[in-house]
Protein backbone atom coordinates (compact mmCIF):
# COMPACT_ATOMS: atom_id res chain seq x y z
CA UNK A 1 0.00 0.00 0.00
CA UNK A 2 1.41 3.37 -1.05
CA UNK A 3 1.16 6.64 0.85
CA UNK A 4 2.48 10.11 0.08
CA UNK A 5 3.43 11.91 -3.12
CA UNK A 6 5.38 10.28 -5.94
CA UNK A 7 5.64 10.21 -9.72
CA UNK A 8 3.07 7.48 -10.51
CA UNK A 9 5.36 6.09 -13.22
CA UNK A 10 8.29 5.81 -10.78
CA UNK A 11 6.97 3.84 -7.82
CA UNK A 12 9.08 1.08 -6.26
CA UNK A 13 6.88 -1.45 -8.06
CA UNK A 14 7.93 0.14 -11.35
CA UNK A 15 11.56 -0.37 -10.28
CA UNK A 16 10.97 -4.05 -9.62
CA UNK A 17 10.86 -3.68 -5.84
CA UNK A 18 7.59 -5.50 -5.19
CA UNK A 19 5.66 -7.19 -2.41
CA UNK A 20 6.46 -4.63 0.27
CA UNK A 21 4.03 -3.73 3.04
CA UNK A 22 3.39 -0.02 3.43
CA UNK A 23 5.52 2.36 1.35
CA UNK A 24 5.60 5.99 2.46
CA UNK A 25 6.79 8.35 -0.27
CA UNK A 26 8.34 11.73 0.47
CA UNK A 27 6.85 12.32 3.91
CA UNK A 28 7.68 15.74 5.32
CA UNK A 29 9.53 16.22 8.60
CA UNK A 30 6.59 16.17 11.07
CA UNK A 31 5.23 12.97 9.52
CA UNK A 32 8.64 11.29 9.63
CA UNK A 33 9.18 12.27 13.26
CA UNK A 34 5.69 11.02 14.10
CA UNK A 35 6.32 7.70 12.34
CA UNK A 36 9.73 7.22 13.96
CA UNK A 37 8.36 7.82 17.46
CA UNK A 38 5.31 5.62 16.85
CA UNK A 39 7.54 2.79 15.60
CA UNK A 40 9.79 3.00 18.67
CA UNK A 41 12.87 4.09 16.72
CA UNK A 42 13.69 6.81 19.24
CA UNK A 43 12.23 9.55 21.43
CA UNK A 44 11.07 13.09 21.02
CA UNK A 45 13.51 15.36 22.81
CA UNK A 46 13.48 18.95 23.95
CA UNK A 47 12.22 21.35 21.31
CA UNK A 48 11.07 18.42 19.18
CA UNK A 49 14.50 17.01 18.32
CA UNK A 50 14.53 13.28 17.58
CA UNK A 51 16.79 11.29 19.92
CA UNK A 52 18.05 7.96 18.63
CA UNK A 53 20.74 5.33 18.98
CA UNK A 54 22.42 3.50 16.10
CA UNK A 55 23.07 0.33 18.08
CA UNK A 56 26.29 -1.60 17.53
CA UNK A 57 27.50 0.68 14.73
CA UNK A 58 28.32 4.20 15.92
CA UNK A 59 30.55 5.05 12.96
CA UNK A 60 31.17 4.13 9.35
CA UNK A 61 32.38 0.67 8.34
CA UNK A 62 34.98 1.48 5.65
CA UNK A 63 36.32 -2.07 5.50
CA UNK A 64 32.84 -3.30 4.54
CA UNK A 65 32.49 -0.93 1.59
CA UNK A 66 32.69 -2.32 -1.97
CA UNK A 67 32.50 -1.27 -5.61
CA UNK A 68 31.12 -3.76 -8.12
CA UNK A 69 33.92 -4.59 -10.57
CA UNK A 70 32.64 -4.35 -14.15
CA UNK A 71 34.35 -3.50 -17.47
CA UNK A 72 32.85 0.01 -17.50
CA UNK A 73 34.75 1.04 -14.35
CA UNK A 74 37.70 -1.38 -14.45
CA UNK A 75 40.20 1.26 -15.57
CA UNK A 76 38.88 4.24 -13.58
CA UNK A 77 38.42 2.93 -10.03
CA UNK A 78 41.31 3.13 -7.55
CA UNK A 79 41.21 -0.57 -6.67
CA UNK A 80 44.01 -0.31 -4.12
CA UNK A 81 41.62 1.79 -2.02
CA UNK A 82 38.23 0.35 -3.06
CA UNK A 83 37.44 -3.32 -2.42
CA UNK A 84 35.94 -5.04 -5.48
CA UNK A 85 32.75 -7.12 -5.53
CA UNK A 86 31.84 -9.55 -8.32
CA UNK A 87 28.67 -8.64 -10.28
CA UNK A 88 27.23 -12.09 -9.59
CA UNK A 89 27.69 -11.65 -5.83
CA UNK A 90 26.01 -8.25 -6.04
CA UNK A 91 23.05 -9.75 -7.90
CA UNK A 92 22.62 -12.40 -5.20
CA UNK A 93 22.83 -9.75 -2.49
CA UNK A 94 20.29 -7.57 -4.30
CA UNK A 95 17.85 -10.45 -4.82
CA UNK A 96 18.16 -11.63 -1.22
CA UNK A 97 17.62 -8.13 0.13
CA UNK A 98 14.48 -7.66 -2.00
CA UNK A 99 13.12 -10.97 -0.74
CA UNK A 100 13.87 -9.94 2.85
CA UNK A 101 12.07 -6.62 2.34
CA UNK A 102 8.74 -8.19 1.33
CA UNK A 103 5.87 -7.41 3.67
CA UNK A 104 7.86 -4.74 5.52
CA UNK A 105 7.24 -0.99 5.73
CA UNK A 106 9.64 1.33 3.90
CA UNK A 107 10.17 5.07 3.60
CA UNK A 108 11.19 6.64 0.30
CA UNK A 109 12.73 10.08 -0.19
CA UNK A 110 13.32 11.52 -3.68
CA UNK A 111 16.04 14.15 -3.37
CA UNK A 112 18.68 16.15 -5.21
CA UNK A 113 22.38 15.60 -4.56
CA UNK A 114 23.95 18.94 -5.49
CA UNK A 115 22.79 22.55 -5.37
CA UNK A 116 23.70 23.27 -9.01
CA UNK A 117 20.64 22.33 -11.12
CA UNK A 118 22.88 21.49 -14.10
CA UNK A 119 25.09 19.11 -12.15
CA UNK A 120 22.85 17.65 -9.47
CA UNK A 121 21.97 13.98 -9.27
CA UNK A 122 18.39 12.79 -8.73
CA UNK A 123 18.66 10.22 -5.92
CA UNK A 124 16.03 7.94 -4.41
CA UNK A 125 16.70 6.77 -0.84
CA UNK A 126 14.73 3.71 0.31
CA UNK A 127 15.02 3.24 4.07
CA UNK A 128 13.68 0.72 6.56
CA UNK A 129 13.86 3.26 9.40
CA UNK A 130 11.68 6.35 9.34
CA UNK A 131 14.40 8.39 11.03
CA UNK A 132 16.86 7.47 8.26
CA UNK A 133 14.39 9.08 5.89
CA UNK A 134 14.37 12.16 8.12
CA UNK A 135 18.18 12.17 8.23
CA UNK A 136 18.68 12.01 4.47
CA UNK A 137 15.91 14.58 3.95
CA UNK A 138 18.05 16.95 6.04
CA UNK A 139 21.31 16.00 4.36
CA UNK A 140 20.41 16.13 0.68
CA UNK A 141 18.41 18.86 -1.06
CA UNK A 142 14.63 18.72 -1.12
CA UNK A 143 12.66 19.23 -4.36
CA UNK A 144 9.57 21.41 -4.40
CA UNK A 145 6.48 19.29 -3.80
CA UNK A 146 5.33 19.86 -7.40
CA UNK A 147 8.70 18.60 -8.69
CA UNK A 148 8.03 15.22 -7.12
CA UNK A 149 5.26 14.55 -9.65
CA UNK A 150 7.84 14.28 -12.45
CA UNK A 151 10.85 13.09 -10.42
CA UNK A 152 12.79 10.27 -12.10
CA UNK A 153 15.50 8.74 -9.90
CA UNK A 154 18.86 8.32 -11.61
CA UNK A 155 20.30 6.39 -8.67
CA UNK A 156 18.62 4.37 -5.93
CA UNK A 157 20.01 3.65 -2.47
CA UNK A 158 18.43 0.81 -0.49
CA UNK A 159 19.23 0.76 3.23
CA UNK A 160 18.08 -2.33 5.10
CA UNK A 161 19.60 -2.54 8.61
CA UNK A 162 17.67 -5.71 9.51
CA UNK A 163 19.27 -7.69 6.67
CA UNK A 164 22.49 -9.55 7.45
CA UNK A 165 24.74 -10.35 4.52
CA UNK A 166 26.38 -13.75 4.08
CA UNK A 167 30.09 -13.30 3.22
CA UNK A 168 30.29 -16.66 1.44
CA UNK A 169 27.21 -16.01 -0.70
CA UNK A 170 27.49 -12.25 -1.17
CA UNK A 171 31.23 -11.79 -1.61
CA UNK A 172 31.63 -9.42 1.33
CA UNK A 173 33.79 -9.41 4.46
CA UNK A 174 31.19 -9.58 7.26
CA UNK A 175 27.40 -9.51 7.62
CA UNK A 176 27.56 -5.73 7.13
CA UNK A 177 27.93 -4.40 3.59
CA UNK A 178 27.86 -1.12 1.64
CA UNK A 179 28.26 -1.63 -2.09
CA UNK A 180 28.03 0.60 -5.18
CA UNK A 181 27.10 -0.70 -8.64
CA UNK A 182 27.84 1.93 -11.28
CA UNK A 183 26.29 -0.12 -14.10
CA UNK A 184 22.97 -0.60 -12.31
CA UNK A 185 23.06 2.82 -10.60
CA UNK A 186 22.27 1.14 -7.32
CA UNK A 187 23.73 1.29 -3.80
CA UNK A 188 22.92 -1.39 -1.22
CA UNK A 189 23.48 -0.91 2.54
CA UNK A 190 22.82 -3.73 5.01
CA UNK A 191 23.17 -4.46 8.73
CA UNK A 192 24.13 -1.00 10.00
CA UNK A 193 21.93 1.72 11.46
CA UNK A 194 24.68 4.35 11.36
CA UNK A 195 23.08 7.14 9.33
CA UNK A 196 26.38 8.51 8.03
CA UNK A 197 26.59 5.57 5.61
CA UNK A 198 23.63 7.06 3.72
CA UNK A 199 25.26 10.42 3.07
CA UNK A 200 28.78 9.12 2.47
CA UNK A 201 27.60 6.56 -0.08
CA UNK A 202 26.07 9.39 -2.13
CA UNK A 203 29.25 11.45 -1.62
CA UNK A 204 31.35 8.57 -2.96
CA UNK A 205 29.05 8.40 -5.96
CA UNK A 206 29.46 12.12 -6.73
CA UNK A 207 33.21 11.82 -6.23
CA UNK A 208 33.24 9.39 -9.15
CA UNK A 209 30.75 11.04 -11.49
CA UNK A 210 31.71 14.73 -11.25
CA UNK A 211 35.46 14.52 -12.06
CA UNK A 212 34.42 12.82 -15.31
CA UNK A 213 32.65 16.10 -16.12
CA UNK A 214 35.65 18.25 -15.18
CA UNK A 215 34.15 19.14 -11.80
CA UNK A 216 36.32 18.94 -8.68
CA UNK A 217 34.61 16.99 -5.88
CA UNK A 218 35.83 18.02 -2.44
CA UNK A 219 35.63 16.85 1.17
CA UNK A 220 35.58 20.38 2.54
CA UNK A 221 33.52 23.14 4.09
CA UNK A 222 32.93 26.41 2.24
CA UNK A 223 31.82 29.98 2.86
CA UNK A 224 31.81 33.37 1.16
CA UNK A 225 31.88 37.01 2.20
CA UNK A 226 28.46 38.34 3.15
CA UNK A 227 26.94 39.98 0.10
CA UNK A 228 29.76 38.83 -2.19
CA UNK A 229 29.51 35.26 -3.47
CA UNK A 230 32.67 35.79 -5.55
CA UNK A 231 34.77 36.02 -2.38
CA UNK A 232 34.52 32.31 -1.58
CA UNK A 233 36.81 30.04 0.41
CA UNK A 234 37.03 26.28 0.84
CA UNK A 235 38.40 24.46 3.90
CA UNK A 236 39.79 20.96 3.37
CA UNK A 237 40.39 18.92 6.49
CA UNK A 238 40.12 15.52 8.11
CA UNK A 239 38.09 14.88 11.25
CA UNK A 240 39.14 16.98 14.22
CA UNK A 241 41.02 19.66 12.29
CA UNK A 242 38.39 22.40 12.65
CA UNK A 243 36.63 22.23 9.27
CA UNK A 244 33.16 22.91 10.65
CA UNK A 245 34.23 25.31 13.40
CA UNK A 246 36.46 27.57 11.30
CA UNK A 247 34.10 27.83 8.33
CA UNK A 248 31.26 28.84 10.68
CA UNK A 249 32.31 32.48 10.72
CA UNK A 250 29.64 35.06 11.66
CA UNK A 251 31.25 37.55 9.27
CA UNK A 252 30.81 35.19 6.30
CA UNK A 253 27.95 33.22 4.71
CA UNK A 254 28.15 29.44 5.17
CA UNK A 255 27.76 27.52 1.91
CA UNK A 256 28.13 24.14 3.59
CA UNK A 257 30.15 22.17 6.12
CA UNK A 258 31.32 18.95 4.45
CA UNK A 259 30.85 18.17 0.73
CA UNK A 260 31.22 20.51 -2.25
CA UNK A 261 31.91 20.69 -5.96
CA UNK A 262 34.02 23.22 -7.89
CA UNK A 263 32.78 23.64 -11.45
CA UNK A 264 33.49 26.14 -14.22
CA UNK A 265 30.87 28.38 -12.57
CA UNK A 266 32.15 28.21 -8.99
CA UNK A 267 31.49 26.25 -5.82
CA UNK A 268 28.30 24.44 -4.86
CA UNK A 269 27.17 22.38 -1.90
CA UNK A 270 26.27 18.75 -2.50
CA UNK A 271 24.03 18.84 0.54
CA UNK A 272 21.20 20.74 2.18
CA UNK A 273 22.12 20.12 5.79
CA UNK A 274 24.86 19.55 8.34
CA UNK A 275 26.00 16.47 10.25
CA UNK A 276 27.89 17.99 13.17
CA UNK A 277 29.85 16.32 15.93
CA UNK A 278 28.35 17.13 19.33
CA UNK A 279 30.87 15.72 21.80
CA UNK A 280 31.91 18.52 24.20
CA UNK A 281 29.78 20.99 22.25
CA UNK A 282 29.13 24.19 24.20
CA UNK A 283 26.85 27.21 23.71
CA UNK A 284 29.85 29.49 24.20
CA UNK A 285 32.14 27.97 21.56
CA UNK A 286 29.57 27.00 18.91
CA UNK A 287 26.22 28.60 19.82
CA UNK A 288 24.41 27.97 16.53
CA UNK A 289 25.27 24.28 16.30
CA UNK A 290 24.43 23.87 19.99
CA UNK A 291 21.04 25.51 19.43
CA UNK A 292 20.10 23.03 16.69
CA UNK A 293 20.11 20.16 19.19
CA UNK A 294 16.82 21.40 20.61
CA UNK A 295 15.14 22.38 17.34
CA UNK A 296 12.27 20.47 15.79
CA UNK A 297 13.24 17.39 13.74
CA UNK A 298 16.99 17.69 14.34
CA UNK A 299 18.30 14.12 14.50
CA UNK A 300 20.37 13.69 17.68
CA UNK A 301 22.43 10.53 17.29
CA UNK A 302 23.99 8.42 20.08
CA UNK A 303 23.92 11.13 22.74
CA UNK A 304 23.30 10.20 26.37
CA UNK A 305 20.37 12.08 27.93
CA UNK A 306 18.46 12.25 31.21
CA UNK A 307 15.52 9.86 30.90
CA UNK A 308 13.28 12.13 32.96
CA UNK A 309 14.19 15.64 31.77
CA UNK A 310 15.53 14.66 28.30
CA UNK A 311 18.47 16.98 28.93
CA UNK A 312 21.42 16.08 26.70
CA UNK A 313 24.85 15.33 28.17
CA UNK A 314 27.29 16.80 25.66
CA UNK A 315 30.34 15.47 27.52
CA UNK A 316 29.27 11.83 27.88
CA UNK A 317 31.08 9.59 25.40
CA UNK A 318 30.02 6.29 26.98
CA UNK A 319 28.11 5.24 23.84
CA UNK A 320 30.67 6.74 21.45
CA UNK A 321 32.87 9.81 21.07
CA UNK A 322 31.25 10.15 17.64
CA UNK A 323 28.00 11.72 18.88
CA UNK A 324 26.31 13.80 16.19
CA UNK A 325 23.31 15.84 15.17
CA UNK A 326 21.82 16.29 11.70
CA UNK A 327 19.81 19.36 10.77
CA UNK A 328 18.84 21.42 7.71
CA UNK A 329 21.11 24.30 6.72
CA UNK A 330 18.33 26.81 7.31
CA UNK A 331 18.79 26.20 11.04
CA UNK A 332 22.04 28.19 10.73
CA UNK A 333 21.28 31.91 10.55
CA UNK A 334 24.04 32.89 8.13
CA UNK A 335 23.71 29.89 5.79
CA UNK A 336 23.39 30.37 2.05
CA UNK A 337 19.89 29.82 0.69
CA UNK A 338 21.22 28.74 -2.72
CA UNK A 339 24.14 26.56 -1.60
CA UNK A 340 26.28 28.15 -4.30
CA UNK A 341 29.23 30.53 -4.40
CA UNK A 342 31.82 31.85 -6.82
CA UNK A 343 35.28 30.48 -7.46
CA UNK A 344 37.33 30.25 -4.26
CA UNK A 345 39.76 33.11 -3.80
CA UNK A 346 41.33 31.14 -0.96
CA UNK A 347 41.88 27.41 -0.57
CA UNK A 348 42.66 26.38 3.01
CA UNK A 349 44.05 22.99 3.99
CA UNK A 350 43.62 22.26 7.68
CA UNK A 351 45.87 19.94 9.65
CA UNK A 352 46.15 19.04 13.31
CA UNK A 353 49.88 18.55 13.83
CA UNK A 354 50.40 16.81 17.17
CA UNK A 355 54.16 16.82 16.59
CA UNK A 356 54.31 20.58 17.22
CA UNK A 357 56.35 21.24 14.08
CA UNK A 358 54.13 23.06 11.57
CA UNK A 359 53.45 26.82 11.82
CA UNK A 360 49.90 28.09 12.45
CA UNK A 361 49.64 29.22 8.82
CA UNK A 362 51.74 28.94 5.67
CA UNK A 363 51.24 30.15 2.09
CA UNK A 364 51.50 27.46 -0.59
CA UNK A 365 52.31 27.55 -4.30
CA UNK A 366 49.92 25.58 -6.55
CA UNK A 367 52.46 22.74 -6.69
CA UNK A 368 52.86 22.74 -2.91
CA UNK A 369 49.07 22.78 -2.58
CA UNK A 370 48.80 19.64 -4.71
CA UNK A 371 51.55 18.03 -2.61
CA UNK A 372 49.73 18.69 0.66
CA UNK A 373 46.36 17.78 -0.89
CA UNK A 374 47.69 14.40 -2.01
CA UNK A 375 49.38 13.92 1.38
CA UNK A 376 46.25 14.74 3.42
CA UNK A 377 48.19 14.92 6.68
CA UNK A 378 46.88 15.14 10.22
CA UNK A 379 47.76 13.19 13.37
CA UNK A 380 46.14 10.97 15.96
CA UNK A 381 46.97 11.65 19.59
CA UNK A 382 47.08 9.45 22.69
CA UNK A 383 43.62 8.37 23.80
CA UNK A 384 41.88 8.71 20.45
CA UNK A 385 42.45 5.04 19.65
CA UNK A 386 43.42 2.02 21.71
CA UNK A 387 47.19 1.53 21.70
CA UNK A 388 48.06 5.07 20.65
CA UNK A 389 50.56 6.32 23.25
CA UNK A 390 52.37 8.97 21.20
CA UNK A 391 51.41 11.10 18.20
CA UNK A 392 50.88 9.06 15.06
CA UNK A 393 50.74 10.51 11.56
CA UNK A 394 47.62 9.99 9.48
CA UNK A 395 47.85 10.50 5.73
CA UNK A 396 44.41 10.38 4.09
CA UNK A 397 44.84 11.51 0.51
CA UNK A 398 42.55 14.28 -0.77
CA UNK A 399 41.55 14.78 2.88
CA UNK A 400 39.05 11.95 2.46
CA UNK A 401 40.54 8.71 1.09
CA UNK A 402 37.58 6.47 2.14
CA UNK A 403 35.26 8.41 -0.18
CA UNK A 404 37.52 8.64 -3.26
CA UNK A 405 36.73 6.02 -5.92
CA UNK A 406 39.19 7.42 -8.48
CA UNK A 407 42.95 7.57 -8.16
CA UNK A 408 44.20 10.50 -5.99
CA UNK A 409 46.06 12.22 -8.82
CA UNK A 410 42.77 12.66 -10.71
CA UNK A 411 41.50 14.93 -7.93
CA UNK A 412 44.93 16.49 -7.39
CA UNK A 413 45.32 17.52 -11.04
CA UNK A 414 41.81 18.96 -11.14
CA UNK A 415 42.53 21.02 -8.04
CA UNK A 416 45.91 22.17 -9.39
CA UNK A 417 44.35 23.23 -12.70
CA UNK A 418 41.62 25.24 -11.02
CA UNK A 419 44.00 26.90 -8.56
CA UNK A 420 46.43 27.82 -11.33
CA UNK A 421 43.89 29.02 -13.90
CA UNK A 422 41.79 31.01 -11.43
CA UNK A 423 44.61 32.38 -9.27
CA UNK A 424 43.39 31.12 -5.90
CA UNK A 425 45.71 31.62 -2.93
CA UNK A 426 46.43 28.45 -0.97
CA UNK A 427 47.14 28.15 2.73
CA UNK A 428 48.10 25.37 5.12
CA UNK A 429 46.65 25.98 8.59
CA UNK A 430 47.80 24.00 11.63
CA UNK A 431 45.22 23.77 14.42
CA UNK A 432 47.35 21.29 16.38
CA UNK A 433 50.17 21.81 18.86
CA UNK A 434 52.86 24.43 19.42
CA UNK A 435 55.72 24.73 21.90
CA UNK A 436 56.26 20.98 21.82
CA UNK A 437 54.49 17.83 20.77
CA UNK A 438 51.20 16.63 22.24
CA UNK A 439 51.74 16.04 25.96
CA UNK A 440 54.44 18.73 26.21
CA UNK A 441 53.26 21.67 24.14
CA UNK A 442 49.89 23.37 24.07
CA UNK A 443 47.05 23.50 21.56
CA UNK A 444 47.27 26.29 19.01
CA UNK A 445 45.14 29.17 20.39
CA UNK A 446 41.86 29.30 18.47
CA UNK A 447 41.92 33.10 18.73
CA UNK A 448 45.25 33.20 16.87
CA UNK A 449 44.00 30.75 14.23
CA UNK A 450 40.89 32.85 13.61
CA UNK A 451 42.92 36.08 13.41
CA UNK A 452 45.32 34.57 10.87
CA UNK A 453 42.46 33.10 8.82
CA UNK A 454 40.58 36.41 8.82
CA UNK A 455 43.72 38.18 7.58
CA UNK A 456 44.20 35.54 4.88
CA UNK A 457 40.60 35.82 3.70
CA UNK A 458 40.43 39.63 3.68
CA UNK A 459 43.79 39.91 1.89
CA UNK A 460 45.67 41.78 4.62
CA UNK A 461 47.99 38.84 5.32
CA UNK A 462 49.45 39.20 1.83
CA UNK A 463 50.92 42.56 2.89
CA UNK A 464 53.15 41.26 5.70
CA UNK A 465 56.68 39.89 5.48
CA UNK A 466 57.11 36.17 4.86
CA UNK A 467 60.03 33.80 5.45
CA UNK A 468 60.76 30.49 3.74
CA UNK A 469 60.45 27.52 6.06
CA UNK A 470 63.72 25.53 5.97
CA UNK A 471 62.01 22.16 6.43
CA UNK A 472 58.92 22.37 4.22
CA UNK A 473 59.77 25.14 1.76
CA UNK A 474 56.50 27.05 2.13
CA UNK A 475 56.20 30.72 3.11
CA UNK A 476 55.34 31.67 6.69
CA UNK A 477 54.33 35.19 7.83
CA UNK A 478 56.73 36.70 10.35
CA UNK A 479 54.18 38.93 12.07
CA UNK A 480 50.54 39.93 12.22
CA UNK A 481 49.03 42.56 14.46
CA UNK A 482 47.24 40.90 17.38
CA UNK A 483 49.05 37.55 17.05
CA UNK A 484 52.01 36.55 19.23
CA UNK A 485 54.93 36.55 16.76
CA UNK A 486 56.59 33.62 18.51
CA UNK A 487 53.70 31.38 17.37
CA UNK A 488 54.68 32.08 13.77
CA UNK A 489 58.11 30.52 14.34
CA UNK A 490 57.41 27.08 15.87
CA UNK A 491 61.08 26.44 16.61
CA UNK A 492 61.20 29.46 18.92
CA UNK A 493 58.29 28.11 20.98
CA UNK A 494 60.19 24.95 21.95
CA UNK A 495 62.32 25.01 25.10
CA UNK A 496 64.94 22.94 23.28
CA UNK A 497 65.47 24.06 19.64
CA UNK A 498 67.55 20.95 18.92
CA UNK A 499 64.60 18.79 19.95
CA UNK A 500 62.42 20.76 17.51
CA UNK A 501 64.93 20.15 14.72
CA UNK A 502 64.91 16.42 15.42
CA UNK A 503 61.09 16.34 15.48
CA UNK A 504 60.90 18.34 12.23
CA UNK A 505 63.32 15.95 10.54
CA UNK A 506 61.19 13.03 11.70
CA UNK A 507 58.00 14.58 10.30
CA UNK A 508 59.67 15.44 6.98
CA UNK A 509 60.70 11.79 6.63
CA UNK A 510 57.12 10.68 7.33
CA UNK A 511 55.84 12.99 4.58
CA UNK A 512 58.48 11.75 2.13
CA UNK A 513 57.83 8.07 2.84
CA UNK A 514 54.09 8.51 2.39
CA UNK A 515 54.41 10.58 -0.80
CA UNK A 516 56.64 8.06 -2.59
CA UNK A 517 53.50 6.26 -3.83
CA UNK A 518 52.41 9.32 -5.86
CA UNK A 519 55.76 10.24 -7.45
CA UNK A 520 55.16 8.21 -10.66
CA UNK A 521 51.92 10.11 -11.32
CA UNK A 522 52.85 13.77 -10.72
CA UNK A 523 54.44 16.48 -12.86
CA UNK A 524 57.85 18.11 -12.46
CA UNK A 525 56.50 21.10 -10.51
CA UNK A 526 54.97 18.91 -7.82
CA UNK A 527 58.07 16.72 -7.70
CA UNK A 528 60.11 19.87 -7.10
CA UNK A 529 57.74 20.88 -4.29
CA UNK A 530 58.04 17.51 -2.56
CA UNK A 531 59.94 17.55 0.72
CA UNK A 532 62.49 15.15 2.15
UniProtKB/Swiss-Prot annotation:
GO terms for molecular function: ATP binding; metal ion binding; phosphoenolpyruvate carboxykinase (ATP) activity. One of its GO terms (biological process) is gluconeogenesis. One of its GO terms (cellular component) is cytosol. This is Phosphoenolpyruvate carboxykinase (ATP). It comes from Cereibacter sphaeroides (strain ATCC 17025 / ATH 2.4.3) (Rhodobacter sphaeroides). It catalyses: oxaloacetate + ATP = phosphoenolpyruvate + ADP + CO2. Mn(2+) binds at residues 200, 219, 258. Transmembrane segments: none annotated. Its cofactor is Mn(2+). ATP binds at residues 200, 219, 237-245, 286, 324, 449. Belongs to the phosphoenolpyruvate carboxykinase (ATP) family. Its EC number is 4.1.1.49. Keywords: ATP-binding, Cytoplasm, Decarboxylase, Gluconeogenesis, Lyase, Manganese, Metal-binding, Nucleotide-binding. CDD domains: PEPCK_ATP. It is an enzyme of class 4 (lyase). Substrate binds at residues 60, 194, 200, 324. Pathway: Carbohydrate biosynthesis; gluconeogenesis. Disulfide bonds: none annotated. It is found in: Cytoplasm. Involved in the gluconeogenesis. Catalyzes the conversion of oxaloacetate (OAA) to phosphoenolpyruvate (PEP) through direct phosphoryl transfer between the nucleoside triphosphate and OAA. It holds the Pfam family PEPCK_ATP. Binds 1 Mn(2+) ion per subunit.
Amino acid sequence: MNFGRVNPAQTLDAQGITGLGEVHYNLIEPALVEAAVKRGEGRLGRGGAFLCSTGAFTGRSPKDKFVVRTPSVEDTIWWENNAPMDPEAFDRLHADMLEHMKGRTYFVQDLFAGADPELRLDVRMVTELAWHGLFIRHMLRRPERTELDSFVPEWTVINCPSFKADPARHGCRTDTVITLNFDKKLILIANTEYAGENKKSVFTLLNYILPGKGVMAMHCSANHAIGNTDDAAVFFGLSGTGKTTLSADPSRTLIGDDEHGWSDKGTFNFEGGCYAKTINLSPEAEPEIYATTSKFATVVENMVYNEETLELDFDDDSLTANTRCAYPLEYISNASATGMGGHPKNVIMLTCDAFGVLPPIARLTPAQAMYHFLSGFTSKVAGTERGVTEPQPTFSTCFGAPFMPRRPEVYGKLLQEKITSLGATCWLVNTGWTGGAYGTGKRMPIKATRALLTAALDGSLANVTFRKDPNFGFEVPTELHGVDSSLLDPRSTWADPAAYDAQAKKLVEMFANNFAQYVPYIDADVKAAAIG
